[in-house]
């Protein structure tokens, strides 16, 4: 029987860093259909509007009954407001199966660092290692995720 992760194993940097979260790059329509059939519930897309889109993902996800959220991440949006929105979306998806993607997994890895540290209790080194496994390559994006986590760590009970 297919699992949500196995249906997406061919996307760039496919990874399942935590139960309930599958990450990677851009899926195809067929992969989204298989993800839904295997129990997928929601898609969080952090690509910028200017990026090439091989399919109308909103239309496809609506047809499939998948929740679809877009929070664009680009050079001008590496701020706390954007990270707050991403973390809210990831937290709201808990207990459901989420596909969290960008074009390659690079931005997703960075955006998950605060989730790993603040919500999962990981040490910074482990959070960064997990983010690299997800697809993080950019030092600038890593700094965005780490700095956010460090500033907000005191906000946690």
List each model region and its residues.
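Short cysteine clusters
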Residues: 102
């Amino acid at each position: 029987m297919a699992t949500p992760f196995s249906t997406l194993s061919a996307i760039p940097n496919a990874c399942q860093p935590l139960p309930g979260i599958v990450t990677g790059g851009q899926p195809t329509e067929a992969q989204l259909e298989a993800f839904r059939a295997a129990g997928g519930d929601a898609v969080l897309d952090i690509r910028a509007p200017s990026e090439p889109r091989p399919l109308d993902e909103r239309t496809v996800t609506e047809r499939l009954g998948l929740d679809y959220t877009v929070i664009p991440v680009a050079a001008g949006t590496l701020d706390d407001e954007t990270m707050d929105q991403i973390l809210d979306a990831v937290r709201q998806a808990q207990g459901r199966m989420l596909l969290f993607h960008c074009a390659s997994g690079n931005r997703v890895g960075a955006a998950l660092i605060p989730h790993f540290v603040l919500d999962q209790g990981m040490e910074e080194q482990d959070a960064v290692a997990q983010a690299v496994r997800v697809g993080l390559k950019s030092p600038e994006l890593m700094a965005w995720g780490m700095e956010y986590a460090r500033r907000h760590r005191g906000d946690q009970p």
